[in-house]
Design a protein with these regions (language model features):
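N-terminal basic/disordered segments at the start of proteins
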Residues: 1-5, 17, 290-319
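Short, glycine-/Ser/Thr-/acidic-enriched flexible segments
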Residues: 1-2, 8, 16-18, 97, ...
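N-terminal glycine-rich anion-binding loops that anchor highly charged ligand groups
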Residues: 2-13, 17-36, 40, 46-47
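Short, well-ordered coil/turn segments that N-cap beta-strands
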Residues: 6-9, 36-38, 63-69, 88, ...
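Short, acidic/polar
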Residues: 20-31, 75-81, 167, 231-235, ...
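Active-site beta->alpha loop and helix N-cap motifs at the rims of alpha/beta catalytic domains
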Residues: 37-169, 300-301, 309-415
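Catalytic alpha/beta core domains of metabolic enzymes, predominantly
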Residues: 108-125, 130, 153-303, 387-505
Length: 505
């Protein structure tokens, strides 16, 4: 099952059965494959587990399952040597392959001492690569945010730069040894760290002339909506930029349950291929590798240093809300509901807005003259990027109290939303931007995956002052609102509930 280059984005999962239990591992691997998994990873704690990979391989292949097996090795390079003889790929963790276990002590090295530590890695790693060459075994260099060595931590700190260097030390040896059957991964449960680090890794690889394929995943993502949203946000943000060759959606559920979620995410992102060109200009002060929040002028509780807001609608007359996730603003269209929610602000179409308490007018890009005559201290201007004409820009310059609600019907809506936010900055405008995302989903999972994937890059780029999810399917408003708040929390820009880190094994 080839990986990288022009090949499809591959989907994988990991067994949670004891690797010495051949029958259980074979049965679970079959379920993963039957669900659509293309690689199966197995925990390989010791030599006995590594040797049993042969029996698992035989059990699968004798029944027609030719799925490649990936041995997951930590702490013991001898285990990796054995696993390389029986698995199609071996994953090693640079944080504990040669460097001793973490003591969380600050270590001081001279340059000569540091170079000697790197030589220790080379002396142990090269024989392993030779075994892999002999057996045609691929290698995954997999860095985890929580397992950087004391040596790396002492020099680089607990930073994306440290994670990248931990990986690059091993990649440079692979290049020196002309070993190219390598895939790399840098994972974290923190989606911001994960996205920033992968972006940085790709940049450093390009500087050094490397182009190894990437495995993407958010570690310990959890189950239910949290796991799906976090994975869609982190993985989706990178896939949207063309980064990633294989993915795993880590859920604390049965391994085969991860596969349909991953498939939906990949299919949604790849459906944008060959989309129409989006003209645009990147803001001059934007740093893709280390983005900061776009500078905006606060309008009431939107923009500036305020937390991103959640907009919602109740156009169907159903006013139910989630008890824990009440939107900040509700778009009511042509008339206020008979019964309003306490603590909620309402948005009405500008031509029917009469200045009622706790209400604000909404304009479209064809209502600029009406906007000029409106005295509201907060206005919402709904506009797609392609309607951001000179007249609209001039109007926004005269009305810093206007919040832009970015709309898009483009196949690559992430790109068009980005283009709008960047164009505002290029024009010198500091109006806050809320991203309007529309769907027609009938299941919560589909909405979570698509909305998470669409919002990821916008959040991590620092462009998001608010989110407005509009769904024309069968989902309740409570589910839609919870998804919006879940996306902001997964992007670590607004916390609305207790978060549990759940390790699936």
């Amino acid at each position: 099952v080839p990986l990288g280059g022009p090949n499809p984005i591959r989907i994988q999962s990991m067994t949670n059965t004891p690797t010495q239990d051949t029958e259980a591992c074979v049965a679970q691997a079959k379920r993963i494959v039957d669900a659509g998994g293309e690689y199966v990873r197995l925990t390989t704690q010791g030599v006995k587990e590594a040797e049993n990979l042969m029996n698992i391989n035989i059990g699968l292949r004798s029944t027609g399952y030719m799925v490649p097996l990936v041995a997951d090795v930590h702490f013991n390079p001898k285990v990796a040597d054995v696993a390389a003889q029986y698995a199609e790929k071996v994953r090693i963790n640079p944080g504990n392959y040669v460097d001793p276990g973490r003591t969380f002590k600050q270590l001081e090295y001279t340059d000569e001492e540091y170079a000697a530590e790197l030589q220790k890695i080379r002396d142990r790693f090269v024989p392993f690569l030779n075994i892999c060459k002999e057996n045609h075994t691929a290698v995954r260099i997999g860095v985890n945010h929580g397992s950087l060595s004391d040596r790396i931590m002492s020099r680089y700190g607990d930073t994306p730069e440290g994670m990248v260097e931990s990986c690059m030390e091993f990649l440079r040896i692979c290049v020196d040894e002309k070993f190219t059957d390598v895939v790399i991964s840098i994972k974290a449960s923190n989606t911001v760290v994960m996205v920033k680090t992968v972006r940085l890794l790709v940049s450093v690889m390009e500087q050094e002339g490397m182009s190894f394929p990437l495995h993407l995943g958010v570690t310990e993502a959890g189950d239910g909506e949290d796991g799906r949203i976090k994975s869609a946000l982190g993985i989706g943000a990178l896939l949207a930029d063309g980064l990633g060759d294989t993915i795993r959606v880590s859920l604390s559920e049965e391994p085969e349950a991860e596969i349909p979620v991953a498939r939906k995410l990949v299919d949604y992102i790849t459906s944008r291929r060959n989309h129409p060109y989006i003209p645009g200009m990147e803001a001059p002060d934007f740093n893709y590798l280390s983005p900061v929040r776009r500078k905006t002028r606060p309008v009431r509780n939107i923009g500036g240093d305020h937390l991103p807001v959640v907009l919602a609608d109740r156009m169907d007359g159903r006013m139910e809300t989630h008890p824990q996730f009440t939107p900040d603003y509700i778009y009511a269209g042509r008339a206020l509901p008979e019964q309003t929610e306490p603590g909620v602000q309402y948005i009405l179409d500008a031509d029917v807005w009469k200045g009622e308490p706790d209400t604000w007018p909404a304009f479209n890009y064809a209502q600029l003259e009406l906007m000029e005559t409106c005295a509201a201290e907060l206005k919402f201007l709904f506009t797609p990027y392609m309607a951001l004409t000179r007249e609209v820009v001039a109007c926004l310059k005269q009305h810093p109290e206007a919040v832009v609600v970015s709309q898009s019907n483009h196949p690559n809506r992430v790109g068009e939303h980005r283009a709008l936010a960047h164009q505002l900055t290029v024009e010198g405008l500091q109006n806050p931007v809320i991203f309007f995302q529309h769907y027609a989903e009938d299941t919560a999972e589909d909405l979570q995956i698509k909305a998470g994937a669409d919002m990821g890059a916008l959040i991590f780029d620092g462009l998001c002052d608010g989110i407005y999810l509009f769904n024309q399917g069968k989902l309740s408003h409570a589910v839609i609102d919870a998804t919006a708040f879940g996306i902001l929390q997964a992007g670590r820009i607004r916390t609305s509930k207790t978060e549990y880190i759940s390790c699936p094994g």
